[in-house]
Amino acid sequence: MLRQVKPKNARTKRALEKREPKLVEGAKTAIFLRGNATSQISLDVLGDIHALKKPFSVNFQKKNNILPFEDASSLEFFSEKNDAALAVMATHNKKRPHNLTWVRFFNYRVLDMIELGIVNYKSIQSFSATPIVPGTKPMILFQGPVFDAHPTYRHIKSLFLDFFRGEPIQKLDSAGLSYVIVVSAAEAQEDETKPLPLVHFRVYGTKLLKTKTNLPRVELEEMGPRIDFNIRRVQPAESDVLEEALKKPKTQEPKPKKNVDVDIIGNKVGRIHVDQQDLGNLQTRKMKGLKRSVEEREDSENEEVEIEEDVISDASE
């Protein structure tokens, strides 16, 4: 736990204000760490994922004697020090070779973790496609019903979306959609004794070709990395902590609009309630043909006088 620093000048105050919680969070920073023992394959995969995450990433070069599933206090320290919400750690041993541990934090405390082992790997340098421009926002596609049906694969889907989503934006030019991340898996078997299906991680670059219409024709070219993961240890988030992490501030929730509906076409339909109006004194356009004569006006005035006299006489009786 880092000590709380009181700002002594304006620069320190601005730096602390950047770390304060915001209604709309920006892109999440990820830290990339090496364990006490690593393999070249795990380090190469770590470097390729770091290239996909740039510029919202911090890469550590030194080894760290950290066992995330036994003691995550060091990871939480690095998370708070670097203001990072994500972490990936590369390790290697006889029991779990070529291992990557993916970690998410909430309030600089570990929210959930998952271990993915590297089974097959082909680096970015092995492909001749144009490299990714740092900061480009990817499209993400999950293939297979298992990502909605199985809790572990739902966990992977949520983590990858959180990891690669980048900075939130309102609009995006089609020319900025330069690559797509495809994550696929076969359907999981009901037999729990059998291992879970592999997670296939692919990255494709997009080529926009001219057509006779306004919409371009899209072609995909694999640009790497190409990785096959097998699922190892999983530490899901606790229900109360996850509920707190997913809570939305009241100011972010749009206020419901009364008496406003949207029809099947998408048109907004509103209902207005108006009080009953008194049309007796409504000023209308006067036309000569509708004007009353002098005799008609005198007769109506005499009738009103007679009615008033009758009312007075009834009251006196």
From Swiss-Prot:
- Tree of life domain: Eukaryota
**What is this protein's name?**
Ribosome production factor 2 homolog
Q: Its GO CC terms? A: cytosol; nucleolus; nucleus; sno(s)RNA-containing ribonucleoprotein complex
Q: Name one Pfam family in it.
A: Brix
Would you identify the family this protein belongs to, as annotated? Belongs to the RPF2 family.
User: Which residues constitute the signal peptide according to the record?
Assistant: none
GO BP field: assembly of large subunit precursor of preribosome; maturation of LSU-rRNA from tricistronic rRNA transcript (SSU-rRNA, 5.8S rRNA, LSU-rRNA); ribosomal large subunit biogenesis
